[in-house]
Amino acid sequence: MIKSKINWRRQIIGNGIVIIVLALIGGFFWYRTVHSQDTWRQVTADKTVVVGVDDTFVPMGFRNAQGDFVGYDVELARATLKKMGLKADFQTIDWSMKETELKTGHIDMIWNGYTKNADRKKKVAFSDSYHHDHQVIVTMKNQQINKLNDLKGKRLGAQTGSSGLLTYNEQGNSLRKTVGSDAQQYDTFDKALNDLQVGRLNAVLIDADYAGYYIAHEKDPEAFKTIKTNFGTDAYGVGMRKGDVTLRNKVNDALAEVKKDGTIDKISQKYFGTDNK
């Protein structure tokens, strides 16, 4: 009787191990398939592309008073995908997890002020560049910060996973040397700017497009000050899985069309007051 119970327990344990191993193997092959496979046939069958966005990132992708997705990137994505006979399904994502969301197949694209850089190019396949921006420091006029050197010993905020923070954290970065400490990280820029206004931060490292739009829509825009950084120009691109070669090529062709027919300039005029840059 005892021997029978032991054999029964061993069988249960053995079966459990087999199930776990099979699940791990299945998950591995599912991950590899999602990550490496060209999904164009599935995309055309669904007629929909899932686009990951940070829905607080004005004016690129955000929600209006009615809760609808709006913004420069949102309208550009819709116009571009329409050229391809597809629709966009916008999904809010944690910006610090954007590449993971893409790799695991939860989204098909990252399209939301996504700066192209060497680190990200290792993880995703970028479209051609469609917009350019740069990093700035936003502070309050009462902080008496007029140039980058005035940030010595100050409390600087930035968004987790943002291109500005990535550059700030690079070895030898001159701004980091000036500040002398890590940047305080936030999951969204609006939270950092709120802390700036109540005095918990001295400055925020942020995209110029975001800063300009945010400040212009504040009750007292004159209370803010913007200082240029020496980070250079950021080129925005659409991030896709490396295996999605066909999708990437189709996006590039459609982006070229919306540039040529003036659609992108109309969208840019709406959100920035200028033609696309």
Residue ranges of predicted features:
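A structural signal for short loop-to-beta-strand junctions that line the ligand-binding cleft
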Residues: 40, 72-73, 121-130, 224-229, ...
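Extracytoplasmic small-molecule ligand-binding "clamshell" domains
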Residues: 10-16, 36-113, 261
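Periplasmic-binding protein-like
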Residues: 55, 132-139, 208, 212, ...
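Flexible hinge/capping segments at coil-to-helix
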Residues: 139-156
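Ligand-binding cleft/hinge of the Venus flytrap
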Residues: 63-64, 77-86, 164-186, 215-220
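Ligand-binding clefts/hinges and TM-proximal coupling segments of bilobed small-molecule sensing domains
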Residues: 21-38, 45, 163-183, 222-226, ...
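Short helices/loops that flank or line small-molecule/ion binding pockets
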Residues: 83, 91-92, 96-109, 123-125, ...
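A ligand-binding cleft/hinge motif common to bilobed small-molecule-binding domains
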Residues: 97, 114-122, 169-170, 194-198, ...
